[in-house]
Amino acid sequence: MLRLFRFDVLETSTKDTERPNSKSSRLSSTSGSSHPSSSSRLTVRSAVPEKSAFGSIEFIFYFSVILSILTIACFKIHYVSSPKHPNYKNIEKYLKPGWLFGQKVDSADFQYSAFRENMPILLLVIIVYNFLWRLVKLVFTKNTNDELAIKNNYRLCFSLLFALLVYGTGVIYVLTIALINYLISKSLKNSIFNPLLTWTLDISVVFFKEYFAYCKFSSLHPGLGFLDQYTGILERWYVLFNITMLRLVSFNMDYYWSLKHNSEKLNTLIFDKDREPTTLTFRERVDYSCLDEDYNLKNFLTYIFYAPLYLAGPIISFNNFMSQMKYPTVSTLKYRNLLYAIRFLVCVLTMEFLLHYAYVTAISKDGNWNQYSAVESAMISFIVLFMTWLKLLIPWRLFRLWSLIDDIEPPENIVRCMCNNYSAVGFWRAWHRSFNRWLIRYIYVPLGGSNHSILNLFIIFTFVALWHDISWELFAWGWLIVLFILPERLCCFMSRRTGLTKHPYYRYISGFGAALNIYFMIICNLIGFAVGIDGIKNVLVSFFLTLKGAMSAIAAFIMFFSAVQIMFQIRVNEEEEGINLRC
């Protein structure tokens, strides 16, 4: 049972150790300071007790506080979701018949509801994909030793068919944009116009993607009108194009850097330095360039349309993807994929339980906050945020599980529970981890890294908001995160400069600041992903400007402080095991 929750179930590269003379170590030493919050790790180490203390009276008190408040929260959520509540009649329209003990299910989140309904189809596709591969392997690999080449051809063929099934003739638009990107990279090579045109084209498509709704084949030529009838499962191909855009930039930039800097090749590392391919670290697979001939059209199309990761990610760079097509990763953990599948199932069942017993999404969608007390509003908001985290986690892990079964290991998008974060930067690293790594590699470091950190953070989170969708809520979310990151970084810097980190009570001082940080992060993410700007006004007024609300805010702060002390200790235990997630 304990094996199920080991970190190497999530990611093979989590416990990779960098070799002191490797290129990855040199890159780490130069770019580590360029990371948006390399200082946050120091805060953790300084702020924690030196040995595990979960059995001490202090930590028993912390656990008691958290358990007490969570018990109250459960009763409150059960009440607001029951027919006894006065506002139940207004949220009932968002409820559908469920399968769990006669309870109705909350279907107010249309995006997750659509995924939930189509999950059996996706599972069937995964089974068919692996069955067909075994059939192809049986037929075509009898007289050849080049099994990997055949598998890569199979990946390409299936991925193109999968894209056609999903988008129908809309895949023609995606293919056209992809080929234009490929022509840019191949014609401009190491010219500065390669990245300039790549970024201009792809950001323009993301920005104006809604206009593609009005673009029909019949408007190009009446004879092409029949193509408009075959729209596929997802009629609007441009809705999920954002993920494809990241891959297009990755291919062009990796190819550009391989030529521009005459980067050392991965094959050189393996053969000239006598390295076993199975010992390659994640960083080495990303930083070392592929051979020039690997940046070809077939590999490009396989990477862009790779079926397991096509719809939602996680994001994997072209260099990493190509290296794994040639030298697959090997986990040292027995039955790793099975354990990962069990963890995925636990997440799905947790979500199902919440959807059947906590109708917080329906309450949030209804928006009638006046019907709820300050405590209830706070509990509803927190559970909405937790379910937002879960609704992203589940699709990411399903598609990543498919990829793992296919011997391609992308980064794990979420390595910590939402409730196990106290740093704004650490939270971002652990929330959409593969996207965070993409941002660092393709935006933050090229723009100068920590030399212009504040400006770069503003640019990055503006891009992230634009990438998600063009809305004031998301722009407010991005800019508020930058605003809240600045005092966190300033406090970390001043603590080290003044020697406060050596103070015996620094753990408690740091815990106080981290508890405030949690408040800020909850507010930001509620604005961006849950209740919006209008909704957050009602929550904040009821929570901070009423007597009962203020008392609840104090109780929540005590719980956050207690939780932070436990988070500190968790990270101490991880470091003792050689795990440093830097979040």
Curated annotation (Swiss-Prot):
Residues 15-42 are annotated as: Disordered. Membrane-bound O-acyltransferase involved in the remodeling of glycosylphosphatidylinositol (GPI) anchors. Acts only on GPI-anchored proteins, but not on free GPI lipids. Also involved in lipid metabolism, having profound effects on sphingolipid-sterol-ordered domains integrity and assembly. Involved in cell integrity and apoptosis. The keyword Transmembrane helix applies. Residues 1-52, 141-159, 213-298, 365-373, 534-549 are extracellular. It comes from the Eukaryota. Residues 22-40 have a biased composition (Low complexity). The keyword Mitochondrion applies. The lineage of its organism: Eukaryota, Fungi, Dikarya, Ascomycota, Taphrinomycotina. The chain crosses the membrane at residues 53-73, 120-140, 160-180, 192-212, 299-319, 344-364, 374-394, 445-465, 466-486, 513-533, 550-570. GO terms for biological process: GPI anchor biosynthetic process. It holds the Pfam family MBOAT. Keywords: Acyltransferase, Cell membrane, Endoplasmic reticulum, Membrane, Mitochondrion, Transferase, Transmembrane, Transmembrane helix. It is found in: Cell membrane; Endoplasmic reticulum membrane; Mitochondrion membrane. This is Membrane-bound O-acyltransferase gup1. The active site is at residue 468. Belongs to the membrane-bound acyltransferase family. One of its GO terms (cellular component) is endoplasmic reticulum membrane.
